[in-house]
Amino acid sequence: NHFRDDTSDVEQAEGAASLLAYNKGDKHETALQLGWNVDTLERRLLLLNCAPTVRSALNERRIKLGHAELLAGLPANRQDKVLGGVIEHKVPVEVLKKQLGQFAKRLSDAIFDTAQCIGCPHNSAQQASLFDESIGDGFCQHPSHYDELTMAALEARAVPLRDQFPVVRFVRLEDGFAPLTVGPDGPMGVGATQYTACKGCENFGCSLSAMAGSYGEVHESLCFDAA
């Protein structure tokens, strides 16, 4: 082992990264020289996703390794913000894990191509496979970017719908949207003649779900003027 007994995990990570660069990216050789297995090397290197403020806090023993492992998957600016709260309120590791899990987005709910998420530092799969502390596998820890990708996918789905309907509305949970479905028959039936007229109305259209669990679901034949 090349490190002092009191070397912090971050200092080990930084030293390992330098040795890995010297070895031209050969992780097996680097791990061998450090007296580690490759998993231990990968675990340490993943800590380098921590923002400088988080690294310093871990070096100074103001946070635990578990805190740093959980923060490593967040965008750097969010790491800084969350770190301040962790230190100020002495937030335990388990509480932080629960809080971060509430903001993460499930990749299984995504309607965009998640192939781009493989290897992303914000994909919790990396932390789940290597760290003792993580929010679990299959989550995006960069919710604003996830939302951007979701909206881009929804916009793409809306293009052909706009050729069919005067109104195409994205529906979010906070909208409290209650659709008014119209048709020629059924409980809200208006008759064939009126329904034909409705389809030409500027308030006739469809909704496209922007809500987790139903992303991309389309509800057609809606009236957006219930007055």
Sequence positions of predicted segments:
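C-terminal helicase lobe and adjacent C-terminal extensions/tails of nucleic-acid helicase motors
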Residues: 87-108
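A general structural signal for short secondary-structure boundary/capping elements
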Residues: 76-78, 89-93, 117-120
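Conserved TIR/SEFIR loop-to-helix hotspot centered on a Trp-containing motif
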Residues: 109-227
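Amphipathic, charge-rich alpha-helical segments that serve as recognition/docking helices
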Residues: 1-60, 65-79, 87
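Residue-identity detector for glutamine
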Residues: 12, 33, 42, 79, ...
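Histidine (H) residue identity feature
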Residues: 2, 28, 67, 89, ...
